[in-house]
Amino acid sequence: MDISSGLETHCPRERRSVPRARRFADETLTGWGLAGWGRTGDVLLCVSELVTNAVVHGVPPGRQLLVFLRWDGRLLRVEIHDSGGGEPRATDGDTCAEGGRGLLLVTLLSDKWGVRQRELGKAVWCDFAL
């Protein structure tokens, strides 16, 4: 598959979008023959964390987010597009806080992650080498 192609789904700004996006990613990986891949759990957790961040911090009310997966046989990229402003930053994660560890987990589980500004909002992405 060409890295420029991929599969996507739109999700509303709702907490129930997190399991929906995770299922989409799981079904996509299965369709690409990656169901038994040793990093599938890492990918699914990163999808959950990035979608949660988009729902809580990135998507203005009444808008949707986009989950986009690309795979070229060597590299899997997860992208979460939202129309919110700002740039997310990984923190050390306060051990007493209820949240704040999502990007720390993405940092630890993926090979690389970053933010790409778009005309309207941003795309937060993470890569996994196969």
Residue ranges of model-derived segments:
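Preference for short coil/turn "hinge" residues that link or interrupt alpha-helices
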Residues: C11, E27, T52-N53
